[in-house]
Regions:
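N-terminal leader/signal peptides at the extreme start of proteins
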Residues: 1-5
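A structural signal for multi-pass alpha-helical bundles of membrane permease subunits
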Residues: 7-298
Length: 298
C-alpha cells in the first residue's frame, strides 16, 4: 500500500511539474490582468500622474460613444461566421472520413493553418487580397472583373474579408473535432438506417446530426468566444488602425486602441468588462437553447 501511495504521489508531482509553466503563464498574463482590470475600470488611470476614482463614469461614456457601438455591431457581425464555420467543418469532416486515397494528406493541409500564427496568416492574405494580388489577378484573368477590387480598403468588404480569413484558419480545428466524433460512431446505426430505406440526406440529418450534437454545441461555444474576442487579424491587416475609416473596429481591438493609442486605460478596462459580459450572455443563451433541445441520448 505504501508503494502504491508513493507511486501516486510521484505521478501527481510529475503532473504538477508539467502543468506549472502553463499555469504560471495563465496566472501572470490572463488571470492577474483580469482581476487588475476590474477596479481599473472605475478610475481615470494615469501612467505618470495621479489615478482618480471616477465610479461609473467610464461605463456612462460607453453608452454615448458611437465608436464603441460600432465595435459592438462589428463583433456581433463576426459571430455570424459561427454557423458558416460549423457547416463547412462538418462537410469537410464527412469528406475526409471517407476511405479514399489522399485523405490523410488533405487532413494535414486543412489543419496546417490552425498551427500557423494568425499574424503570419493575416500578412499572407493581405498580399493575396491586394489590388495587385492573386485574387484580383485570377478574377481579371477569368474576365469576371474589369478593375481590381480593393477588398481590404473598402468599408463594405474589409470586415467580410477578415471573417473569411478567420473561417479559413479555424476550419481545420473544428473539422478534427467532428472527424474524431464521426470515427467513433457505431457503424451499425448507419447501416441500419440504410437498410430501413433512408436516403443519404435522411441518414445525415436524422442520424449523424443528432449524434454530433455535443460536438456542435462545444464548437459553437468555442467559436463564439473566439469571434467576439477577435483581435489579431484586424490589428495585422489594418496596421493597428481599425480601418478603413473605423469600419473594422471590433470590441477587443477598440479596447486595445483606447489603452495603447489614447492611453485611456480606465476606459479600456471598462470596454474589456463589457466584452466579457457580452461573451457570457452569448454562451448562456447557447446553453439555455441546448437544454431546451434536450439530450439526443434520452
Amino acid at each position: 500500500m505504501k508503494h502504491i501511495h508513493n507511486v501516486k504521489l510521484r505521478n501527481t508531482l510529475i503532473a504538477w511539474c508539467f502543468m506549472a509553466p502553463a499555469m504560471a503563464i495563465l496566472l501572470v498574463f490572463v488571470f492577474y490582468p483580469i482581476v487588475y482590470s476590474i477596479p481599473l475600470a472605475f478610475t481615470d488611470y494615469s501612467v505618470f500622474g495621479e489615478t482618480a476614482f471616477t465610479g461609473l463614469t467610464n461605463f456612462k461614456r460607453l453608452i454615448a460613444d458611437p465608436d464603441f457601438w460600432l465595435a459592438v455591431k462589428n463583433s456581433c457581425v463576426f459571430v455570424l461566421m459561427v454557423p458558416i464555420l460549423q457547416v463547412l467543418s462538418i462537410a469537410l469532416a464527412l469528406l475526409v472520413n471517407r476511405k479514399l486515397r489522399g485523405t490523410a494528406v488533405f487532413r494535414v493541409l486543412i489543419y496546417l493553418p490552425v498551427v500557423t500564427s494568425m499574424v503570419a496568416v493575416a500578412i499572407i492574405w493581405k498580399f493575396i487580397f491586394d489590388p495587385n494580388g492573386l485574387v484580383n489577378g485570377l478574377l481579371m484573368e477569368w474576365g469576371w472583373i474589369e478593375a481590381p477590387i480593393r477588398f481590404l480598403s473598402s468599408r463594405a468588404l474589409a470586415l467580410p474579408t477578415m471573417m473569411a480569413i478567420t473561417i479559413w484558419q479555424g476550419l481545420g480545428y473544428y473539422m478534427m473535432i467532428y472527424l474524431s466524433a464521426l470515427q467513433h460512431f457505431p457503424e451499425e446505426l448507419i447501416e441500419a438506417s440504410v437498410l430501413d430505406g433512408a436516403s443519404g440526406w435522411q441518414t445525415f440529418w436524422k442520424v449523424l446530426i443528432p449524434l454530433l450534437q455535443p460536438q456542435i454545441w462545444f464548437c459553437s461555444m468555442v467559436s463564439t468566444i473566439a469571434a467576439l474576442g477577435i483581435f489579431d487579424v484586424v490589428f495585422t491587416i489594418t496596421n493597428g488602425t481599425g480601418g478603413p475609416d473605423k469600419s473594422t473596429y471590433v470590441i477587443n481591438f477598440y479596447s486595445y486602441f483606447q489603452a495603447f493609442n489614447k492611453f485611456d486605460f480606465g476606459y479600456s478596462a471598462a470596454i474589456g468588462i463589457v466584452l466579457a459580459l457580452i461573451t457570457l450572455v452569448f454562451n448562456l443563451a447557447l446553453n439555455v437553447y441546448q437544454k431546451k433541445g434536450g439530450d439526443v441520448y434520452d
